[in-house]
């Protein structure tokens, strides 16, 4: 008879090969199952899932499929014509006091709630997810450093914490810190003349995870310290993962030697979620917050609230709270009324400078590159997008817009606007549609923070 290990491998192999199971579904959900041979019988297969969320999700979505696979394929001791499947949450393993202390000592600001299991994967973030999982699972860095970048609220911090949590499960030493906290800690140790302690804390870890790396810019002493921290970690094959709101070359004021090191390994962009992924996120947030919404309300949130995941979750909670306060039934009309203020387009009234900055960041260009006519495709597209958003959101006349982009022929403005509109409305280019949402998100952020372009130069 097969060993228990072989039985588990055989079952998972059959699941992975099944045409009804995508690779993403297998990696995200079904690969997490552990076969329980002690409870299993000839007509019942018992499995453990690592947490309640996965247990519920796999049972609901894949329970029938697992039953079908095991009934059709005689695996191990399952010989009945019809095999039932039971999935339970795995019992927690007890560790001795000393190992528990060491485990906690390695945990620096890693949020337990952010895991790979509850990260919603779609076409917008699949590459980032696969890279992050490979990094977390590897004993030696497969890429070093790793830098993920993209707009606010797209899941970058979630994926960073997921890496940290997975590493902690393997009893690795993990340091997760924002660049602002790194600065605060640096200044405190510097003031106390205790830099040896600072270096020991940040240079003697297996995983160094830095959030908001763009805030290192313009702080020479901090950049110097981070430069040496980076070098020592890299030289000792310790994994470095960085999160930023823009690509390294677009972090203005960051030393060139740091930009160069940020690009040593692999850089990946987190794109705004498509509608299908947004709907999956809304459903997951409802489940996590134990809020029940009608399908049409969840679809409405996915369609009309921005791509920012935190705003989507806020919309869900706002609907629930208002329904409870008014003792009302949650329906589409209630959702529209409650969420009216969240749907206001903050991009209205944008300055030309903010539009230029948002487009530049989204296409990894410098603002100065866009203001000059060029035959390079990405620059030409950027100039068209500036015109498109300027026509939508600013009262600037064609003449001032032409001057802003150094266009001699004012009629070019209409042609550039029509070109983008055609790509969006007729061709429905997925890339341009996604890019439009990203630029709008960046404009919303710039306008909400009242960030002036001139003050950022």
From Swiss-Prot:
Residues 1-77 are annotated as: Domain I, interacts with DnaA modulators. Its main location: cytoplasm. It is found in: Cytoplasm. Signal peptide: none annotated. One of its GO terms (molecular function) is DNA replication origin binding. It holds the Pfam family Bac_DnaA_C. Disulfide bonds: none annotated. The keyword Cytoplasm applies. SUPFAM superfamilies: P-loop containing nucleoside triphosphate hydrolases (SSF52540), TrpR-like (SSF48295). GO terms for cellular component: cytoplasm; plasma membrane. PROSITE patterns: DNAA. Residues 324-457 are annotated as: Domain IV, binds dsDNA. Keywords: ATP-binding, Cytoplasm, DNA replication, DNA-binding, Lipid-binding, Nucleotide-binding. Residues 77-108 are annotated as: Domain II. The keyword Ligase does not apply. Residues 109-323 are annotated as: Domain III, AAA+ region. One of its GO terms (biological process) is DNA replication initiation. ATP binds at residues 153, 155-157. Gene3D superfamilies: 1.10.1750.10, 1.10.8.60, 3.30.300.180, P-loop containing nucleotide triphosphate hydrolases. It comes from the Bacteria. Belongs to the DnaA family. Plays an essential role in the initiation and regulation of chromosomal replication. ATP-DnaA binds to the origin of replication (oriC) to initiate formation of the DNA replication initiation complex once per cell cycle. Binds the DnaA box (a 9 base pair repeat at the origin) and separates the double-stranded (ds)DNA. Forms a right-handed helical filament on oriC DNA; dsDNA binds to the exterior of the filament while single-stranded (ss)DNA is stabiized in the filament's interior. Domain I is involved in oligomerization and binding regulators, domain II is flexibile and of varying length in different bacteria, domain III forms the AAA+ region, while domain IV binds dsDNA. Oligomerizes as a right-handed, spiral filament on DNA at oriC. This is Chromosomal replication initiator protein DnaA. It comes from Helicobacter pylori (strain J99 / ATCC 700824). The gene is dnaA.
């Amino acid at each position: 008879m097969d060993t228990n290990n072989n039985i588990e491998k055989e079952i998972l192999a059959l699941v992975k090969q099944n045409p009804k199971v995508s690779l993403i579904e297998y990696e995200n959900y079904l690969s997490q199952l552990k076969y329980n041979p002690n409870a299993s019988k000839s007509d019942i297969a018992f499995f453990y899932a690592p947490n309640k969320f996965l247990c519920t999700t796999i049972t609901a979505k894949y329970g029938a499929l697992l039953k079908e696979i095991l009934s059709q394929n005689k695996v191990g001791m399952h010989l009945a014509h019809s095999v039932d499947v039971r999935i339970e949450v795995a019992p927690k393993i007890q560790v001795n006091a000393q190992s528990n202390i060491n485990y906690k000592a390695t945990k620096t600001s890693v949020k337990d709630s952010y895991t790979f299991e509850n990260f919603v994967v779609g076409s917008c973030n699949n590459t980032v997810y696969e890279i992050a999982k490979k990094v977390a699972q590897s004993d030696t860095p497969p890429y070093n450093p790793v830098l993920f970048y993209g707009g606010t609220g797209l899941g970058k911090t979630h994926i960073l914490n997921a890496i940290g949590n997975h590493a902690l499960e393997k009893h690795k030493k993990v340091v997760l810190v924002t660049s602002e906290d790194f600065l605060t800690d640096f200044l405190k140790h510097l003031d106390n003349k205790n830099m040896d302690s600072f270096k020991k804390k940040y240079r003697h870890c297996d995983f160094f995870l830095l959030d908001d790396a763009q805030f290192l810019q313009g702080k020479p002493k901090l950049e110097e310290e981070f430069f040496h921290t980076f070098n020592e970690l890299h030289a000792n094959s310790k994994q470095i993962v960085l999160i930023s709101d823009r690509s390294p070359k677009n972090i203005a004021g960051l030393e060139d030697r740091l930009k160069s090191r940020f690009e040593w390994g692999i850089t990946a962009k987190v794109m705004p979620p498509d509608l299908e992924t947004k709907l999956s996120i809304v459903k997951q947030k409802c489940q996590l917050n134990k809020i029940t919404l009608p399908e049409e309300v969840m679809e409405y949130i996915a369609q009309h609230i921005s791509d920012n995941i935190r705003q989507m979750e806020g919309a869900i909670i706002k609907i629930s709270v208002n329904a409870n306060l008014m003792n009302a039934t949650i329906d589409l009309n209630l959702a529209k009324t409650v969420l009216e203020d969240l749907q206001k387009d903050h991009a209205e009234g944008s300055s030309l400078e903010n539009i230029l900055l948002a487009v530049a960041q989204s296409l990894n260009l410098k603002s100065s590159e866009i203001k000059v006519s060029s035959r390079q495709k990405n620059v030409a597209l950027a100039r068209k997008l500036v015109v498109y958003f300027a026509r939508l959101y600013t009262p600037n006349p064609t003449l001032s817009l032409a001057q802003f982009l150094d266009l001699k022929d004012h009629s070019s403005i209409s042609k550039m606007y029509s070109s983008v509109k055609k790509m969006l409305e007729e061709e429905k280019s997925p890339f341009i549609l996604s890019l439009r949402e990203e630029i709008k998100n960046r404009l919303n952020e710039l306008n909400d923070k009242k960030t002036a372009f001139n003050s950022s130069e």
